[in-house]
């Protein structure tokens, strides 16, 4: 069912039946039939707009009040479908998870999932979460929480990282977006803390750092899920409210076992002496390429100086880890193991990537409107831009097109951003416009399309942006608009597309583009391209507006000049009188 077709339907009168039949009151049977039809239509619309599957729907599209054959057949077909799904589920459950016991088993597993693990004394990966019962005596409550939330089978990054972490090894992990990295570090972190019997108010033992508040909130939500019912562990996110309570000595930080935080807020509390990081046993840096970048590197370094426990274990996770970040990681770690799932600089193979040449800035808006007309604009959609000003401008343009759209950027408060994300996940917003503030980590499971309205400044930024779609093995699409000014900036993106196997998403002439020098790469990363304003206002109207503005400015200038002249005249007259 095409929801847009239903919403655009009109109404007409049947001329053949005559006026009396058109305006006659409906009978009881007709009313009931119409009611069933409306209910089924409403259910269909609800299901189609529930992009992220967060709502509860009626399983039967018809009520049981009628006694017709159609209702009976519908119920029977529903029962048959239910039986079929139960049978398939039962068959799936009968298939035993793979048991990995030897190095040969581990190598076969790694070849199958394109995993590369380097370092000394590499542990054998787990084949299932049940493997952890025998090998690591996983807490039963944690295991049941995983199963209850349908985390039945571990992903390749989880299979590799969990045994490495539980063997107390430092870790550098790189895996595609949407591959389950959050659980890959949360499960062993929680398991190690629960396995040690320590006194209450011992102090913070686990610290997770993330670059954005949105990502920190998401990590904390996952942490709450797997620790539900575990009374001996206390977890928290360092929110503005909690930071205030700690700084005012209302609460002591020693009551928490695990803290999730962004760097600046954590540093502020630590500097005031209201949080002790000296007892931390496990430090996890999520989105490490961002936190070791020039914007966050000093903050990350300051946090590391306060983590003074000699037995501390460090882990870094990201979808992209450049060689410069690896070098920095090696300098702060002890004999780390390195996991690469897939290619180091590639995007998920579930994402269909495409480069679209638009000529100029106006061409980008025309391209979006063309996508809408051709039915390629299937919500939910995320559109990325390079600046807040441009995000706001596009928001107003798409509002003019009467699209169900909202915008997120750094100028909006955390509460406003949370509300927009919630509405987007519920399907109330179909198109979300944003800057790179949402490019990392935030998990939207049902996003169909990502549009890079502005070309990202690096291959890493591109991988993280398009990683908002194609998550958890689902198919997704990513479209990047580029203009004549982006001829050099698209080269890193082209390399990512090649490594991901998306050779049909760009024109063949792009193959002949030369390699970028180090100087050119640095310039692209550090200097944003100066772009024209986002607007579809005709040139004639723009000129008229400019003329009017110039006239107003000239009028104001003349008034000021006349005032100054009159003041000078009055001053000279006063002098003469004296």
Swiss-Prot record:
Motif DEAD box: positions: 286-289
Key words, A-Z: ATP-binding, Helicase, Hydrolase, Nucleotide-binding, Nucleus, Ribosome biogenesis, RNA-binding, rRNA processing
Membrane-spanning segments: none
Annotated positions binding ATP: 175-182
Catalysed conversion reaction: ATP + H2O = ADP + phosphate + H(+)
Biased composition (Basic and acidic residues): 44-53, 78-94, 517-531, 561-578
Chain ranges of the Helicase ATP-binding domain: 162-339
GO molecular function: ATP binding; ATP hydrolysis activity; RNA binding; RNA helicase activity
Domain Helicase C-terminal: 350-514
InterPro entries: DDX52/Rok1_DEADc, DEAD/DEAH_box_helicase_dom, DEAD_box_RNA_helicase, Helicase_ATP-bd, Helicase_C-like, P-loop_NTPase, RNA-helicase_DEAD-box_CS
One Gene Ontology biological process: maturation of SSU-rRNA
Classification via Gene3D superfamilies: P-loop containing nucleotide triphosphate hydrolases (3.40.50.300)
Quaternary structure and interacting proteins, as annotated: Interacts with the U3 snoRNA and is associated with the 90S and 40S pre-ribosomes.
PANTHER family in UniProt: ATP-DEPENDENT RNA HELICASE RHLE-RELATED (PTHR47959), RNA HELICASE (PTHR47959:SF15)
Domain comment in the entry: The Q motif is unique to and characteristic of the DEAD box family of RNA helicases and controls ATP binding and hydrolysis.
Name of this protein: ATP-dependent RNA helicase CHR1
């Amino acid at each position: 069912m095409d929801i847009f077709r239903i919403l655009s339907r009109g109404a007409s009168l049947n001329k053949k039946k005559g006026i009396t039949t058109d305006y006659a009151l409906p009978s009881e049977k007709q009313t009931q039939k119409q009611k069933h039809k409306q209910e089924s239509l409403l259910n269909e619309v609800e299901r189609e707009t529930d992009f992220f599957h967060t709502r509860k729907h009626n399983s039967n599209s018809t009520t049981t009040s009628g006694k017709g054959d159609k209702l009976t057949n519908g119920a029977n077909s529903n029962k048959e479908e239910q039986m079929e799904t139960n049978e398939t589920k039962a068959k799936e459950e009968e298939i035993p998870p793979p048991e990995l016991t030897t190095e040969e088993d581990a190598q076969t597993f790694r070849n199958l999932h394109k995993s590369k693990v380097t370092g000394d004394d590499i542990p054998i990966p787990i084949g299932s979460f049940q493997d952890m019962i025998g090998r690591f005596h996983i807490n039963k409550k944690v295991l049941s929480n995983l199963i209850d939330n349908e985390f039945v089978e571990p992903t390749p990054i989880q299979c590799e990282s969990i045994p490495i972490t539980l063997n107390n090894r430092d870790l550098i992990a790189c895996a595609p977006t949407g591959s389950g990295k959050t659980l890959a570090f949360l499960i062993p972190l929680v398991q190690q803390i629960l396995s040690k019997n320590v006194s209450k108010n011992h102090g913070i033992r686990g610290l997770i750092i993330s670059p954005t508040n949105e990502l920190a909130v998401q990590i904390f939500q996952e942490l709450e899920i797997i620790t539900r019912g575990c009374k001996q562990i206390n977890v928290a996110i360092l929110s503005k409210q909690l930071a205030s309570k700690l700084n005012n000595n209302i609460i002591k930080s020693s009551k928490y076992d695990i803290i999730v935080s962004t760097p600046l807020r954590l540093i502020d509390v630590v500097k005031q002496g209201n949080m002790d990081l000296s007892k931390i046993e496990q430090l996890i840096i999520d989105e490490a390429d961002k936190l070791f970048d020039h914007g966050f590197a000093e903050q990350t370094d300051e946090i590391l100086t306060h983590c003074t426990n000699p037995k501390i274990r460090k882990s870094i996770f990201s979808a992209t880890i450049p060689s410069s970040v690896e070098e920095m990681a090696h300098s702060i770690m002890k004999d780390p193991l390195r996991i690469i799932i897939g290619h180091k600089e590639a995007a998920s193979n579930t994402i269909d990537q495409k480069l679209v040449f638009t000529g100029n800035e106006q061409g980008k808006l025309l391209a979006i409107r063309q996508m809408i007309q051709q039915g390629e604009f299937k919500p939910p959609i995320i559109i990325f831009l390079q600046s807040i000003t441009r995000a706001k401008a596009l928001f107003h343009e798409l509002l003019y097109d009467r699209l169900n759209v909202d915008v997120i950027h750094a100028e909006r408060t955390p509460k406003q951003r949370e509300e927009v994300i919630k509405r987007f996940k519920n399907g109330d917003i179909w198109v979300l416009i944003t800057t790179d503030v949402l490019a990392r980590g935030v998990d939207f499971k049902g996003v169909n399309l990502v549009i890079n309205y502005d070309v990202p400044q690096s291959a890493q930024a591109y991988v993280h942006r398009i990683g908002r779609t194609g998550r958890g093995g689902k198919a997704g699409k990513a479209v990047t608009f580029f203009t004549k000014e982006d001829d050099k900036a698209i080269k890193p993106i082209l390399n990512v597309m090649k490594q991901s196997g998306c050779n049909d998403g760009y024109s063949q002439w792009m193959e002949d583009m030369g390699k970028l020098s180090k100087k050119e790469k640095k310039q692209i990363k550090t200097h944003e391209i100066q772009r024209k304003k986002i607007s579809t206002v005709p040139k004639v109207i723009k000129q008229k507006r400019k003329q009017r503005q110039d006239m107003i400015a000239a009028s104001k200038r003349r008034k000021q000049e006349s005032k100054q002249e009159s003041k000078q005249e009055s001053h000279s007259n006063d002098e003469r009188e004296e």
